[in-house]
Curated annotation (Swiss-Prot):
Highest taxon above the source species: Eukaryota
Lineage: Eukaryota, Metazoa, Chordata, Craniata, Vertebrata
Keywords assigned by UniProt, alphabetized: Calcium, Disulfide bond, Hemagglutinin, Lectin, Metal-binding, Secreted
UniProt-annotated location(s): Secreted
Native source organism of the sequence: Bitis arietans
Molecular functions (GO terms): galactose binding; lactose binding; metal ion binding; rhamnose binding; toxin activity
GO cellular component, one term: protein-containing complex
Disulfide cysteine pairs (residue numbers): C3-C14, C31-C131, C38-C133, C106-C123
Protein name: C-type lectin PAL
Length: 135
């Protein structure tokens, strides 16, 4: 585990919640600038979702939803991760994703679900965000 003290180590990667509110693209840009190879976080199994949810509940200072690295680049419900990893696991909140008013193409962790479930949201909304890095 080479993660810095305030990062969560999991499956060879390190995760950190940032409370500063940013639009989705700005959040992804922030993660990338933090260190080469960093992105908004991607998830590949239920266990990861639970561990991240617990970590965010413990460390997130605020009520904001939290951006992750999933987005619908083509705007056709074909969700992709910014780290180009395989979209092999999805855990949507009830009745989501819905592309509400054809404007929601970025994905957030929903605070009311304890950050366990996902919602598609307007990419320009300001949220906290979760970066994932290799150190």
């Amino acid at each position: 585990n080479n993660c810095p003290p305030d990062w969560l180590p999991m499956n060879g990667l390190c995760y950190k919640i940032f409370d500063e509110l940013k639009a989705w693209e700005d959040a992804e840009r922030f993660c990338r600038k933090y260190k080469p190879g960093c992105h908004l976080a991607s998830f590949h199994q239920y266990g990861e979702s639970l561990e991240i949810a617990e970590y965010i509940s413990d460390y997130h200072k605020g009520q904001a939803e939290v951006w992750i690295g999933l987005w619908d680049k083509k705007k056709d419900f074909s969700w992709e991760w910014t780290d180009r990893s395989c979209t092999d696991y999805l855990t949507w909140d009830k009745n989501q994703p819905d592309h509400y008013q054809n404007k929601e193409f970025c994905v957030e962790l929903v605070s009311l679900t304890g950050y366990r479930l996902w919602n598609d949201q307007v990419c320009g909304s300001k949220n906290a965000f979760l970066c994932q890095c290799k150190f």
